[in-house]
């Protein structure tokens, strides 16, 4: 008989900053973009200057406002990056040119495994906004090392034509937690994308059932699964005919038919049953459920937890099912883990022809911001007094869901390192990831058993 797994890990949810306060919400929808970027720059500027003193040398650079820049004088300016990409589609142009905003071009069966990327152009350029002024950047900077919304310090000179020639870039300082030794296993799945139709969901449901059984079999073979301290289910849990990342997706979401809205309700019932059944397994200690864009919660980053009324069975077992934010950060015995549903990374990949998912996350660590493309190409709640998506501490592990391919990378940071993992959609691959906390090794397991 199976015996329940007793978890000895000290768990702590450290996602408080992703929860919006009443102060954040007050007057939110009267704010402009510049207030969001202003708050971001205000928080990151001291860390950029701190890093500049370490990398360039204290007293070896002149920190100046862009408005005070003189031609051919080397100065250090801190500001926000803006990437001007000619091929980037405009929703305003689409509204003017198409009555239905490309809704007729939506393909029901279109493959979404690969990220659609913007084609490069000689018209593409990089600008820096600082002190309510904008200047074009050239020199020691490329389109593949920055993104719109990044805060950076640039050391260089203002040229004759009003172009700033960059000699050196300085990013915010990085705070890395101490190394810790932890024994245990955490499992991760992402992108269930359930539709509520049993035929459409057949492979996903059978894969989840297979995974639940595999995690609870106590047999002595090489495929034996260790006791699972936590299972983290990364959204989206339900399929919405949309990925929320472009004009067609927005229109598709706004024009769902009655039948499609009904299917969303049915899919929630399916999700509730499956997650609750997994949580009841004796060898699974706790299930964390984090939402994605399209799930029944706000689609503006950071996403709040799904309300328990949407998952009533899970709500009744609150000790084993934990409804959390997106992004979601937690610690187990001091080991810090961050998960995110991946819309931020998918949007970043659109702006580069070279990046992989791991490249994008490595840049996120360098920029010290989870989603610099908020609120430019990714919906974000307009918080003005603070930026909840700034990385105060770089986690030991970052798991990014809903990516085209499985991928991982160890990124060295000041004597420590961060493990970044790109996790594909379970609905398409039936692949789950098992993280060994003692050595941060990964086990990829496929639960696709088609006959």
UniProtKB/Swiss-Prot annotation:
Where it mainly occurs, coarsely classed, is: nucleus
Which CDD domains does this entry report, sorted A to Z?
MPP_PolD2_C
Q: Which Gene3D superfamilies match?
A: 2.40.50.430, 3.60.21.50
Kindly indicate whether the keyword Mitochondrion belongs to this entry: no
Entry keyword annotation includes Nucleus: yes
Where is the protein localized?
Nucleus
Reactions this protein catalyses: DNA(n) + a 2'-deoxyribonucleoside 5'-triphosphate = DNA(n+1) + diphosphate
Molecular function (Gene Ontology), one example: DNA-directed DNA polymerase activity
Pfam families this protein is in? DNA_pol_D_N, DNA_pol_E_B
UniProt KW keywords: DNA replication, DNA-directed DNA polymerase, Nucleotidyltransferase, Nucleus, Transferase
Any one Gene Ontology biological process term? DNA strand elongation involved in DNA replication
Q: What is its EC number?
A: 2.7.7.7
| This protein's GO CC annotations | delta DNA polymerase complex
User: What sort of enzyme, by top EC class, is this?
Assistant: transferase
What role does this protein play?
A: The function of the small subunit is not yet clear.
Instruction: Tell me the subunit arrangement.
Output: Heterodimer with subunits of 125 kDa and 50 kDa.
Family, according to the entry, reads as follows: Belongs to the DNA polymerase delta/II small subunit family.
- Protein name in the entry: Probable DNA polymerase delta small subunit
Q: Which organism is it from?
A: Caenorhabditis elegans
Q: What is the lineage of its organism?
A: Eukaryota, Metazoa, Ecdysozoa, Nematoda, Chromadorea
């Amino acid at each position: 008989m199976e015996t329940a797994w007793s978890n000895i890990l000290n768990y702590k949810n450290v996602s408080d900053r992703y929860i919006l306060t009443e102060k954040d919400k007050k007057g939110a929808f009267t704010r402009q973009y510049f207030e969001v970027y202003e708050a971001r720059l205000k928080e990151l500027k001291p860390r950029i200057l701190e890093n500049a003193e370490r990398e360039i040398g204290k007293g070896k650079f002149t920190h100046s406002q862009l408005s005070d820049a003189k031609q051919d004088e080397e100065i250090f300016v801190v500001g926000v990056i803006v990437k001007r990409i000619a091929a980037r589609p405009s929703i305003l142009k689409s509204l003017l040119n198409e009555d239905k905003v490309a809704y007729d071009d939506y393909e029901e069966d279109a493959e979404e495994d690969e990220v659609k990327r913007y084609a490069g152009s000689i018209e593409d350029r990089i600008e820096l906004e600082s002190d309510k002024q904008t200047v074009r950047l050239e020199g020691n900077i490329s389109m593949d090392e920055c993104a719109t919304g990044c805060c950076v310090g640039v050391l260089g000179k203002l040229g004759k034509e009003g172009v700033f020639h960059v000699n050196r870039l300085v990013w915010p300082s990085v705070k890395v937690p101490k190394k810790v030794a932890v024994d245990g296993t955490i499992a991760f799945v992402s992108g269930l994308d359930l539709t509520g139709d049993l035929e459409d969901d057949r492979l996903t449901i059978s894969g989840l059932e297979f995974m639940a059984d595999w995690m609870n079999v106590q047999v002595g073979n090489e495929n034996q699964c260790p006791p699972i301290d936590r299972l983290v289910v990364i959204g989206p849990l339900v399929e919405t005919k949309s990925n929320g990342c472009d004009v067609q997706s927005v229109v598709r979401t706004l024009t769902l038919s009655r039948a499609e809205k009904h299917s969303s309700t049915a899919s929630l019932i399916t999700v509730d049953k499956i997650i609750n059944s997994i949580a009841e397994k004796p060898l699974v200690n706790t299930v964390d459920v984090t939402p994605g864009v399209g799930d029944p919660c706000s689609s503006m980053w950071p996403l709040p937890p799904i309300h328990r009324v949407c998952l009533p069975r899970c709500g009744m077992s609150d000790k084993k099912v934990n409804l959390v934010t997106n992004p979601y950060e937690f610690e187990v015995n001091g080991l810090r883990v961050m998960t995110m549903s991946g819309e931020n990374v998918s949007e970043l990949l659109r702006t580069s022809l070279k990046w992989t998912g791991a490249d994008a996350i490595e840049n996120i660590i360098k920029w010290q911001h989870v989603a610099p493309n908020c609120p430019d190409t990714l919906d974000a709640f307009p918080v003005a007094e603070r930026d909840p998506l700034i990385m105060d501490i770089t986690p030991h592990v970052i798991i990014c869901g809903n990516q085209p391919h499985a991928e991982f990378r160890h990124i060295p940071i000041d004597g420590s390192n961060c493990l970044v993992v790109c996790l594909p959609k379970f609905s398409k691959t039936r692949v789950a990831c098992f993280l060994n906390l003692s050595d941060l090794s990964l086990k990829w397991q496929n639960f696709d058993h088609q006959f």
